[in-house]
UniProtKB/Swiss-Prot annotation:
Pfam families: BRCT (PF00533), DNA_ligase_aden (PF01653), DNA_ligase_OB (PF03120), DNA_ligase_ZBD (PF03119), HHH_2 (PF12826), Nlig-Ia (PF22745). The gene is ligA. The active site is at K133. It catalyses: NAD(+) + (deoxyribonucleotide)n-3'-hydroxyl + 5'-phospho-(deoxyribonucleotide)m = (deoxyribonucleotide)n+m + AMP + beta-nicotinamide D-nucleotide. NAD(+) binds at D45, S46, E47, Y48, D49, S94, I95, E131, R154, E190, K307, K331. The lineage of its organism: Bacteria, Pseudomonadati, Pseudomonadota, Betaproteobacteria, Nitrosomonadales. This is DNA ligase. GO terms for biological process: DNA repair; DNA replication. It comes from Methylobacillus flagellatus (strain ATCC 51484 / DSM 6875 / VKM B-1610 / KT). PROSITE patterns: BRCT (PS50172), DNA_LIGASE_N1 (PS01055), DNA_LIGASE_N2 (PS01056). The keyword DNA repair applies.
Length: 693
């Protein structure tokens, strides 16, 4: 047995080592609680990794000290032969769904509850708890004396499946509860996959040529039902607790809201998007508020849930057909529906990209009737195997362009053929007849016609005139169509040519009276006072968005310096890689583009130029801001411009890396999260003072 260091023959652990190991476990549990529950980590990831490695090394050297609840034991168990059935001690009941998806649904639920309790109008409102209805997989976690002993799916409500081996791989879920734990505590909640995690996972899978997940919900459900926990551990899963099952040896709080607070104190993640309010008005307001911010949430929901807050009233209300009378799910209009893809058309964008567009049998989804959906490009068509005549699932979320997310292949008509975009258009641009090509490194098929192509010309003008570019008010799509179709505007510079664009020529167009024509001329004159970054963005250089345009303007300071820069010089600009650098260099290498720029400047477009300076000298360099609510005297776009002009960055979400949150009136969850994280919060006056320093 010489040299044996592990297993039954390990030497006894030195005195005090067991205490050190347990202290390391407690430290890791605290770090997990701060990161996953409080969303306020106290140490960087590197320190967490260091402590974890130290614990792992000690346990490897002294396996007799390993315990089932150790953080090192989350991953690595053997694969299961099958998922075993589990009978729930307290049934996992489903919740009735309110059929009215408008705010009226809240009033319907309140009326039923009041009737069941025998309340009269003069008896006053009922207190309710309102929370989100997550689109994931319902889960029951059983803790005994503070240790996680079992995790089970809902199944039919009476019997689920044992998935403990997979749940243990989730760092969000504590293997040991914090503080004084009950004898038995069953926690009910939802396993889900956030949208950012879903996108990152699929991007990695595509990069390695592996299968991708269809949607976050399927990803969560499929991951939890894996037989091999090592596979589940590779999936980025999350969990929210929202209720109780069996409890023993625990003083259950008096209200549902207090239950959630108690679960959070025990170390379980609880969603902060919840509220307590009086009466149906509060529920309807919650439904409307969450509906408005639904698409900004990092996870999928399909509605909200209302519960009578007092647990004694819940017991009095009881159940009906295995559904509680004291709760209801109030859904939003569906964001995904099935319909038939009747045809595929193509559109030509300002960069020449020829995009396939699905023409659909009209379907009501996401609150509107949808007849078109983007198919993105040939790669996406191939990946989803989309064909004309297919029954497809269409998704529309908020203002996002509807897209075809999947195909119901069981309903595919006989004789359907794969769709090849280049073949469908005969290898030619459908607008100008120029050759269409697909470069090896690109997903898009492109027209080679440039500004000879009317479609590219129209889109280039609309982009040039857009609010974040030259901001030419009144130059909309219908007017641009006329200007291009009647050959009044062939290049961007023609917009400022008084021989082509004047009162006489404009007033002769459809729906352009003298006043409208004069307003447009005034807007064109006003747009001549520009900024360098807006002008760069307005030129429509491929791969150059607002942020890159600002970086270029800040770095070079002068347009002629930017025009003279080669690919290597351009790559010295922050966040400009070889692809973007090549796009910029190729754009300015074209004599036609340089001529248009000369004419634009000759027409009077100007800005203040500097010699350029490193961004590090900017007063807000390295600072990240988040804007929320309504500011008294300026729009969010104006505030964003001021911050970025001073070298700061503006983000759409609050995190521990946020430097300042600028809050106006009616600030929402971003302000609450900032307060929870202890971040610096400014009003408009505070922001202006900071900018003036």
């Amino acid at each position: 047995m010489t040299g044996m260091q592990h297993g039954l023959f390990s030497p006894p652990a030195p005195a005090g080592l067991a205490e050190k190991v347990e202290a390391l476990r407690a430290t890791i549990r605290r770090y997990d609680y701060e990161y996953y529950v409080l969303n306020a980590p106290s140490v960087p990831d590197s320190e967490y990794d260091r402590v974890f490695r130290e614990l792992k090394a000690l346990e490897d050297a002294h396996p007799e000290l390993v315990t089932p609840d150790s953080p090192t034991q989350r991953v690595g168990g053997a694969a299961m032969a099958e998922l075993m059935p589990v009978r729930h001690h307290v049934p996992m009941l489903s919740i009735e769904t309110e059929t009215d998806t408008t705010p009226q649904g809240a009033y319907n639920f309140d009326a039923r509850v009041r009737k069941k309790l025998g309340l009269l109008p003069e008896d006053g409102p009922i207190e309710y708890a309102a929370e989100l209805k997550f689109d994931g997989l319902a889960m029951s976690l059983r803790y005994e004396h503070g240790l996680l002993v079992q995790a089970a799916t809902r199944g039919d409500g009476e019997v689920g499946e044992d998935v403990t081996h997979n749940i243990r791989t989730m760092r969000q879920i504590p293997l040991q509860l914090h503080g004084e734990a009950p004898e038995v505590l069953e926690v009910r909640g939802e396993v889900y996959m956030s949208r950012p995690d879903f996108e990152r996972y699929n991007a990695r899978q595509r990069e390695h040529g592996k299968p991708t997940l269809v949607n976050p919900r399927n990803g969560a459900a499929g991951s939890i039902r894996q037989l091999d926990p090592r596979l589940a551990a590779q999936r980025p899963l999350s969990f929210f607790a929202y209720g109780l099952g069996e409890t023993k040896g625990w003083q259950v709080p008096l209200t549902h809201a207090q239950v959630l607070d108690a679960l959070k104190a025990l170390g379980l993640p609880v969603c902060n998007e919840r509220a307590v309010g009086m009466g149906a008005e509060a529920l309807a307001a919650f439904h409307q508020a969450i509906s408005a911010k639904r698409d900004q949430l990092p996870y999928d929901i399909d509605g909200v849930v209302y519960k009578v807050n007092r647990l004694d009233l819940q017991r009095e209300l009881g159940f009906r057909s295995r559904e509680p009378n004291w709760a209801v799910a109030h859904k939003f209009p569906a964001q995904e529906e099935m319909t038939v893809l009747e045809h595929i058309d193509v559109q030509v964008g300002r960069t020449g990209a020829i995009t396939p567009v699905a023409r659909l049998k009209p379907v009501f989804v996401g609150g509107v009737t949808v007849t078109n959906a983007t198919l993105h490009n040939q790669d996406e068509i191939d990946r989803k195997d989309v064909r004309i005549g297919d029954t497809v699932v269409v998704r529309r979320a908020g203002d996002v362009i509807p897209e075809v997310v999947s195909v119901i292949k069981e309903r595919r008509p006989a004789g359907s053929q794969p769709y090849i975009l280049l073949d469908a258009i005969g290898g030619l641009c459908p607008v100008c007849g120029s050759h269409a090509v697909r470069l090896p490194e690109e997903a898009a098929v492109r027209c080679t016609g440039g500004l000879f192509c009317a479609a590219q010309r129209k889109q280039a003008i609309l982009h040039f005139a857009s609010r974040r570019a030259m901001d030419i008010e009144g130059l909309g799509e219908k007017l641009v169509d006329q200007l291009v179709d009647q050959n009044m505007v062939e290049t961007l510079a023609d917009l400022y040519d008084p021989g082509k664009i004047n009162l006489e020529t404009l007033s002769g167009l459809d729906r352009m009276a003298m006043k409208s024509a004069q307003n447009l001329l005034d807007a064109l004159q006003k747009s001549k006072q520009a900024t360098l970054n807006r002008f760069i963005y307005a030129l429509g250089i491929r791969n150059v968005g607002e942020a890159t345009a600002k970086d270029l303007a800040r770095h070079f300071g002068r347009l002629d310096a930017l025009q003279a820069a080669d690919v290597d010089t351009l790559q010295q600009v922050p966040d400009v890689g070889p692809v973007v650098a090549r796009s910029i260099a190729e754009f300015f290498a074209e004599e036609h583009n340089r001529e248009v720029i000369r004419k634009l400047r000759d027409a009077g477009i100007h800005w203040s130029e500097t010699d350029g300076q490193p961004a590090s000298s900017s007063k807000l360099e390295g600072k990240t801001f988040v804007l929320t609510g309504t500011l008294p005297t300026m729009s969010r776009d104006e505030a964003k411009e001021k911050i970025e002009a001073a070298g700061g960055k503006v983000s759409g979400s609050v995190s521990k890396k946020t430097s300042y949150v600028v809050a106006g009136s009616d600030a929402g969850s971003k302000l609450a999260k900032a307060q929870e994280l202890g971040l610096a919060i400014l009003d408009e006056e505070g922001l202006l003072s900071l900018l003036a320093e």
